[in-house]
Amino acid sequence: MIEKMILRRFFSTKSSTMRAWVSENGSGVELKEVPLPVINKPGQVLLKVKAASVNPIDVDMSQGYGREFLGTWKKIESCDAAASRFPLIPGRDCTAVVESVGGDVHNLAPGDEVMAVVPVILPGTHAEFVVTDSKYCSKKPSNLSFVSAAALPYVASTAYSAFTIARVSQRNAKQQRVLIHGGAGGVGSMAIQLLKAWGCEKIVATCAKGSFDIVKQLGAIPVDYTSDQATQELIEHAPFEVILDTVDSQLAKWSDNVMGVWRNCVHVSIVSPLMREMDKNGVPLGLVTTAMKHFERSFQSHLRGRWFSYAFFRPSSDLMSQLSRFAEDGKIVPVVEQVMGFEELEKAYEKVSQLNGRGKTVIKYD
C-alpha cells in the first residue's frame, strides 16, 4: 500500500536505460549506458532533460572534488560503510519535460515544461533523465527556449543562497549598496540581475575590461580588476553594505576596506575551502581547518562591526518561483555564451574549466 501511494501517477518510460556522462573514479567523464533513475520518494519527479548548463563545480566534481563529503553522506544515508560517491553523474540544473511524478506531487504533471535544480547528493543532469524534488522545479518561462532557460537555475540558486546569508532580499534590497567580484561570470551576472529585480540602490561589479558591455547592460557599474586604479575606483564608490565574491582574488580580500564600519555589513564568498580541505584532510579535520581559515578571514572584520561568511549552492523553492516570474517579466535575462551538443560535453567541460567565461555554457540534448 505504501509503495503504491509513493508511486501514484508514475508513468514508466519505454526503456529501462539511458545515456549519461559518468565519472567512475574522479578522473573525468565518459558517455555510458546506465539504468534509468527511478522515483523513490512521493515528492519527487522524473524529468526528461532538454538542456543543462555546465558549471565549474561540475568539472571539479568529475575530477574528484567533494569526494570525502559526498562519500560520507552516502554512507550515512545508505547505512553502508562501504558506500562510495562514485559512479557520479555531474550537472546541477536543467530544463526538462516532466516524465512522471510521485504520489504527493500535485503542482506538476507529465508533459509540463520546467526548470529544475538537483541537490549535490543526487545523480545530476548531464544525463537523458534525472530525478529531483518537485519543490526544486518551476514552470519554464514561456518566453524562453529550453536552452536559454537552462542557464538560470544553478547560478540563481547560488546567488540567492549568498544573499540569504547576507540578509539581502526583495524586502530590503532598495537600501543596499553591493559590490560583486566577478560580475561577468555565471553567478556574478545572475547576482546583478537578482539585485536589480529587487530594486537594489547601487551595484558595482569587478570584471575584465572586455566584459564592461555585459556588466553595464545588466545594470551594474563595472570596475576593471586588472587596473592599477581598481582600488581607488572602489574607494570612490564606497561604502558597501554587502560584498559578494564569486571569484577568489587579492582585490576581493582587500575589499573589506570598502565596507561600512559598525553597520553590520556582510562580506560573502562562494569560494569556500571546505570541500578541498575535507578532500585533503578527511571530513573531521577538514571541518576544523576550514573553521580556522574562516576565523582568520573574519577576525579583523568583526573588530570593526562587520562579518564574513562562506556561501554554497543550495536549492530553494522560494527562489525557483521568483525566477520564473522575473524571467517572464523580462527582469532576468539568460546570459548564454556558448551552446554545445550532448555528445560534446567533454569539450564544454574543457571550456568551462578555463574560468574566463562571459556567461553560461549550455548543453542542448536534442
From Swiss-Prot:
Belongs to the zinc-containing alcohol dehydrogenase family. Quinone oxidoreductase subfamily. Its main location: mitochondrion. Plays a role in oxygen metabolism in the mitochondria by regulating the levels of reactive oxygen species (ROS) thereby conferring resistance to oxidative stress. Involved in resistance to P.aeruginosa PA14 infection. Regulates lifespan. Disruption phenotype: Under hyperoxic conditions or low temperature (16 degrees Celsius), lifespan, body size and fertility are severely reduced and sexual maturity and egg hatching are delayed. Slight increase in the number of apoptotic cells at the embryonic comma stage. Also shows strong susceptibility to UV irradiation and paraquat treatment. Does not show increased sensitivity to X-ray radiation. Increased sensitivity to P.aeruginosa PA14-mediated killing. Body wall muscle mitochondria appear enlarged and abnormal with less developed cristae in hypoxic or hyperoxic conditions. Expressed in pharynx, muscles and intestine. GO terms for biological process: defense response to Gram-negative bacterium; embryo development ending in birth or egg hatching; innate immune response; positive regulation of growth rate; regulation of multicellular organism growth; response to oxidative stress; response to oxygen levels; response to superoxide. It is found in: Mitochondrion. Keywords: Mitochondrion, Oxidoreductase, Stress response, Transit peptide. Residues 1-20 form a transit peptide. GO terms for molecular function: NADPH dehydrogenase (quinone) activity. It comes from the Eukaryota. This is Reticulon-4-interacting protein 1, mitochondrial. SMART domains: PKS_ER (SM00829). One of its GO terms (cellular component) is mitochondrion. It comes from Caenorhabditis elegans. Its EC number is 1.-.-.-.
